[in-house]
Amino acid sequence: MIMSTCAANCIPLLIQQSVDGTYSFNRSWAEFKVGFNDSRGNYWLGNDLLHQLTNGARYKLQCVLQRTSRVFYVANYNIFLVGSESSNYTLSVGRYRGGAVGPGDAMAIHDGMMFSTYDRDNDLSSGNCAQQHGGGFWHNNCYSAGMTVMKDQGDGFVWKTLSYGTLQRATLLLTC
């Protein structure tokens, strides 16, 4: 197990990045377990490592959402914890904190959800959200924060509390 302490001056750690919605996050349980990336910057850290990091320290989650080259939204959560594989990497997120132009709380419905992929369906939907929308995530029924959804699978990156349109880029960061 990786034990870590969170210093006040820690550097944010990239958990996930979807550069433009054309990269497929429709990956297997085994791939999400260890993580993956490509040369353009699309990235998933890996669920095992997320569990190891967050199990030993108190971390926060920062979601950076880019609508256009000049329009960004930031959503912060005061707790981010990922359970072990035996719990299906159950997600715990704390209270939402947004800025003056915050995007709103789209992660709340994902709190307490198990991770789902096309080959391991743990969501609350009668279907398979990861398979339907083209990406593994802590789906509920199905998502409010569609951080791994491909543009050709419907909405593209979505943060449902934003009033209109899709996002160009979505990034999740582990912060202190």
Where do the protein language model's features map onto the residues?
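Mature extracellular or lumenal effector domains of secreted proteins
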Residues: 1-176
